Every structure is written in structure tokens, then in C-alpha cells.
Amino acid sequence: MRLRLPVVCFLWEIAMIVLFGIFVRYNDEADPHWSEFMKAQNITSDIQNDYYFRYPSFQDVHVMIFVGFGFLMTFLKRYGFGSVAFNFLLAAFGIQWAILMQGWFHTFKNGKILIGVESLINADFCVGSVCIAFGAILGKVSPVQIMVMTLFQVTLFAVNEWILLNLLHVNDAGGSMTIHTFGAYFGLTVAWILNRPRLKQTNDKEGSVYVSDLFSMIGTLFLWMFWPSFNSAVSYHGDAQHRAAINTYCSLAACVLTTVAISSVVNKKGKLEMVHIQNATLAGGVAVGTAAEMMLTPYGSLIVGFICGIVSTLGFTYCSPFLSNKLRLHDTCGIHNLHAMPGLIGGIVGAVTAACATEAVYTADGLKKMFRFEGDYATRTPSMQGGYQAAGLCVSLAFGLVGGTVVGCILKLPIWGDPSDENCFDDEVYWELPEEDEEEHLGAANQYVTHLPENFKLPDRTEVAFK
């Protein structure tokens, strides 16, 4: 790694500098000519600059990508550094490449890519799909493999997004299809290609401890709190953005209760499992993404969250072991249960909600604005839109599976320096760890134990820690 990682980071960052220098420029709202643009567009105040509408949402989304996803993956007892820092690395590189790729497809004008605050949000969305895929292979790949995967996945994401939004003309405000379905099935396919048959027999480091689960819960709470911003960040100003935040809020709240209920039901002693609370409580935000700005209604959002809490929790209990034991698909973070299945549900909910849209509910102008029934799409009806939404879900699924297969085969090449089975899920391979005087800690623990009453019984977790 001493040679591979520095070379990849230096060369790719130099490439980003060159490409940004050639192609990337500020858009009208970030350019010094903003005052002239204001006059041309009859804009009377600087407060109407898109920055003031989008930046609060951008802040929330940015925190989700770097803090939320990063800390959510710190549950592994010996891979905390890698979880947070490698997520940081892939996201920092990914947003640069995403600005270029998405810019070439969406904001390329007169030979230049014009970027503003919405470009930053969309780049974060793109990187979000990579963070999701990273969860499936967490602890089993090298940093160089992570960078290579990011390069290819961002490219495929941009192509898939362009097909859905520009060719099929679908709505996907919160990215149930473009972000979650694509990212999850891409990551799962890569994990399947990179399967390690002897991993369970040769490595016992995959697992959590009390403190690592607590750190992971920090990521959960950041994601849960900011998900309404995630799903509404790029919606139209006004009622659509407002509605997206409300629908997400309701779905997330319902999801928590059903997750807790099912977690207790499936446990033989009726106890709760932290892996369910860390992950399944977020499934409602995933599933409401596509239909977030549609007239899903508050009670409809509660129903979506209710269903996803059940599906995701049962997935962690039954699907994950099945995938690992029968299909040789080892999913470290359980993204199949948090992103893949809820993403499919979200795509279906979006298709049905779009197909059921009427002028009586949206008004004639509202219906045209919601689904952009204008220009080449002026003759499209809600039922047709529902069909295209379903087609978009299939395209995202296909891109994830086929793209994941190709990229997985590339990552399987020995030139990337992947870790051995024995070194998986262990920070020591890639990080200088702080030295600890184990004898001093054990001595202090033993001294504490000798002063306890003879009939004192230590809690189970403490006994395990002392052992």
C-alpha cells in the first residue's frame, strides 16, 4: 500500500485539477455577473439567489454523507478507523468526479460545466450511492480497491441518472431508484464477486462491542434527523419541497416503532437487537424517496414507514443469513435490508402514486409542474408516467447488477493489493494504532474485581470485556 495508495491519490487528484481547470466554471448565480443576470431575469433581490434556498439542505446532506454514513459503519469492533476514514476518502474523491460526470450530462454549456450549490447537492447524492455500496464490502477490500470502485460507480451512476431523469423523464426526488436501488445492488453484486469462502473459518474479527455499537448509533441519529432534508433537497421550491420533508418525517417516525416491535418479536427473549435499531429505523426514509414530493399524504407515508420497518428488520433476521450461507453473498452492513429492499419498495410506491395522480388532487397546473408534463412530454398521462416510473426502477436494478458484475471482476484482479482473509475487518493492516499497555489495563481491572463483594455478579457485557 505504501506505493499504490499514494500514486492513485496523487495522480487522480492531479487529473481532477486539470479537468476542473479545463471544464468547470461558476454558474450565473455564483458568478460576479450575477447583477447583470438579475436584471435580465427581473430578479429584485439577492435573497432570490438559489444559494439561500438550497444551502441549508446542502449542509444537512453533507453531514449525512460524511458523518452519518461514516459513523453508521463503525459498529465493527476493530475497524472504526477504516469505517470513518475510508468513507471520508471515497466521498472526497467521489464528489469531485461526480461534479464532472453529472456536469457533462446536465449542465454542460458552450464547452463548460457550470456549477452552483445544487451541483454540490447532486454530487453528494451520487457519492451517497457509493457509500451504500461500500457498506457491503466494508472491511474486506483495500483503500485502492475502494478508490477504483468509486471511479467506476460514479460514472455508472451519472449514466443511469441521465437515462432516468432525461430519457424516461421520471421523478425520483429522494433517490429510491437512482441512489438506493442502484447503489445497493451494485454493492451486493461486487460483494458476491469478491466472495471469500474461508472468511468465517479464518477470521473472528467481524462483530461489534458495546462502544462500537454506540458510535454506530451516532451515525443512525444523524441520518434519521437529516433525512427529510435529503429527500427534499432538490425538489421545486414551495409546496413540493415542503411536502417531501413532511412525507419523509412521517415515514421515518412510523418506521422506528415497527422496527422496535419486530426486533422484540423475533428475539427469543423478547430483547431488542442494536443492529435493527441502527439500520432498520432508517428504511422508511429510503422507501419514501421517489414519492416524497408527490401527494402520498401523511397517512400514506406512515403506512410506507410501517411496512419498511417490518421488512427491513425481518431482512436482518432471516435474509442476511440466507444470503451468506446459501448464495455466498457476505453483506457486511446489511445494505440489502436497509437500502435494496426499501429502495425497490420506494420505486413501486412512486410508480403507483404517479399512476393514481389526478387533476382533482394536484390541480391542472400542479399536475403539469409535478411531473413536468411539458414540451416533448406534454401528452403524457399519469398512468403513462406510472409505467415510466416502473421502467426506471428496472433500469436502475439492471445498472446495479450488470455494473456491479463488471466492476467486481475488475476489483478481483490481484494488482490492487486486497487484504488476506486473516486481515479483514482489522485496522492494524492499514493504520498506525495507538499503543496500549495491556498489562496495565488488565491489572487495573483485576484490582477492581478483588474489591467486589463475594456474592457480586458482574453484568454479561462486563464479564466479556474483562475476559
Curated annotation (Swiss-Prot):
Coiled coil region boundaries: none
Membrane topology: Multi-pass membrane protein
GO biological-process terms attached to the record: ammonium transmembrane transport
Gene name tied to this protein: rhcg
Domain of life of the organism encoding this protein: Eukaryota
InterPro entries: Ammonium/urea_transptr, NH4_transpt_AmtB-like_dom, RhesusRHD
Ranges per topology, Cytoplasmic: 1-3, 77-80, 140-145, 195-213, 267-271, 317-337, 412-467
GO molecular function, one term: ammonium channel activity
Extracellular side: 25-55, 102-119, 169-173, 235-245, 293-295, 359-390
Purpose of the protein: Functions as an ammonia transporter.
Main location: membrane
UniProt family annotation: Belongs to the ammonium transporter (TC 2.A.49) family. Rh subfamily.
GO cellular component: apical plasma membrane
Keywords from the UniProt entry: Ammonia transport, Cell membrane, Glycoprotein, Membrane, Transmembrane, Transmembrane helix, Transport
Glycosylated position list: N42
Protein name in the entry: Ammonium transporter Rh type C
Transmembrane segments: 4-24, 56-76, 81-101, 120-139, 146-168, 174-194, 214-234, 246-266, 272-292, 296-316, 338-358, 391-411
